[in-house]
Amino acid sequence: MTERVLLVDDEEEFLEIMAERMRVRDMEVTTSTSASEALELIAAESYDAVIMDFQMPEMDGIQALKAIREKKPEMQIILLTGHATVEKGVEAMKAGAMDFVEKPADLDALSEKIKKAHHQKAVIVQKQSQDKVIEMLQKYGM
């Protein structure tokens, strides 16, 4: 199954190169140059993973991650950074990121993380569906 990915970065050249490299690997990639546009896309579409730059002008990756978590807690988010530190990694994970990748991203490693995100999202969605069925059965005394 093809993974659907939203790639968010304010550096357009990086965005275009990464998107093309991901498409060559049969991923369906949508791109966005801002966190606010990404939030609109996430509200309207379904993605297996969001890969987002840690530092963007209007809203950073952590702020965007928190906004996404409020609306779509099942969304798998991988943050990208050009300045990886242990502190940034810890901050990203505490905020709810699935993972954290240093730029320039190793596409093999990133592809594996995206596959993992696809699987994790499917498990979460399945559990949510099961929880709804159980809730309905309990509601009607079954």
Question: What positions do the PLM features span?
Answer:
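Receiver (REC) domain active-site loop signature in two-component systems and cognate sites
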Residues: 56
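Helix N-cap/capping motif at the beta->alpha junctions
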Residues: 31-40, 61
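CheY-like receiver
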Residues: 119-142
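C-terminal output helix
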Residues: 105-115
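Short amphipathic alpha-helix used as the core "switch/output" element in two-component signaling
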Residues: 40, 62-73
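Two-component/phosphorelay signaling modules centered on CheY-like receiver
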Residues: 12-30
